Amino acid sequence: MSKSITHLVLDTGGIICSSTLLRNSAESFYTIPRVIAEIRDETSRKNFELWGDQVIQRVPKPEFIKKVSEFAKQTGDYSSLSVTDIQILALTYELEVEFNGGDWRLRKYPGQKHINGKPPSNSNSTEDASKPTSSDTASVKETENSDPKSAENEVLEGETTQHSNNKEAHPNTEENKEQEDNEEDDEDDGWITPSNIRKKKAEDGVGESLVQPKHLKVACATTDFSMQNVLLQIGLNLVSSDGFKIQNVKRFVLRCHGCYTVVKDMEKKFCPSCGGNTLIKTTCSINSKGEFQVHLKKNFEWKTRGTKYSLPKPVHGTSNGKGKKNPVLREDQPEYQRAVRRMQRKKEIDLMDEDYLPSLLTGVTKDRMYVQIGAGRKNPNEVRRKKR
């Protein structure tokens, strides 16, 4: 039995679910050491043992990590991707270049319409098969260029002759119409039948648009929507392990809810105009006129609960840097600037580190990759239980 995928890159979700359909869909499987390190609980370890020696661990090259990172920054998904996610995307990119004869069909920036170069000679046959034939295009052009007035006259003539024939053959037309209307109302009560199932699928957006090609050389199995968004915009093949897949690709920007400033740097936490922590991730697009549009949520309300609370007294620094720290409230605070530099440096080192050791071997358990702003996500005015 021939497999539908030759090389499949697995995310953590694809390994944990251990789907039989996923294991039987590809000839070879790839992942990175970070994914194996994320599998910690007993149930997930047992599911990973079902894969046996089928999964090949491989670290992507730094050049592909750099390409994927730059592309994710342009789509606005870079801040939502972890180091593991970026390496999974880079490994898929590397395998696509290796087994598909280069990056001729991949996009270098979002929205690119033309390919990068000529495809290899062995893929010409598949491309020619997907192109429409000259007879098909000619028939389409003929129907488009035909005179609409003559077509309307023919339809009207046909309707008048059919109407006159029906009058002669069926004198009781009103009774027949009432019976037909009643029958149609009884049939179309919302039931899905074999006759209208295609129409229902087309209305729901499920149909031929989601059908995968017969054979894929390289694909990636992930359940993360940010990774799926980057994969589809680059042009890489996507396989969903749990059946949930995005239908439309999106680009994101940050919009300040206080002063309505649009910020394209997705790593920003504070608005560069008003300085508040009021940036919200929103989708954006460019219309046919070339105008930039931001798509806001309908009836959106900014939650003010937990935004007013008492601040502790400022604490002076210590020589060793330990002790209580002042809460981060603005971007120009030294505490925030040091934390941002530390995170950027650590992320760059981890992305380019080929000699990566999992946290199970190094013993590092707590390593936050974000800065707590203010009181954090929890409501500081909420009454909490006392610890015993």
Swiss-Prot record:
SMART domains: PINc. Residues 6-108 form the PINc domain. It is an enzyme of class 3 (hydrolase). Required for the synthesis of 40S ribosome subunits. Has a role in processing 20S pre-rRNA into the mature 18S rRNA, where it is required for cleavage at the 3' end of the mature 18S rRNA (D-site). Accompanies the 20S pre-rRNA from the nucleus to the cytoplasm. One of its GO terms (biological process) is maturation of SSU-rRNA. Residues 177-190 have a biased composition (Acidic residues). InterPro entries: NOB1, Nob1_euk, NOB1_Zf-like_sf, NOB1_Zn-bd, PIN_dom, Ribonuclease_PIN. It comes from the Eukaryota. Residues 119-138 have a biased composition (Polar residues). Residues 110-206, 311-333 are annotated as: Disordered. The gene is nob1. Its EC number is 3.1.-.-. This is 20S-pre-rRNA D-site endonuclease nob1. Residues 139-152, 165-176 have a biased composition (Basic and acidic residues). Transmembrane segments: none annotated.
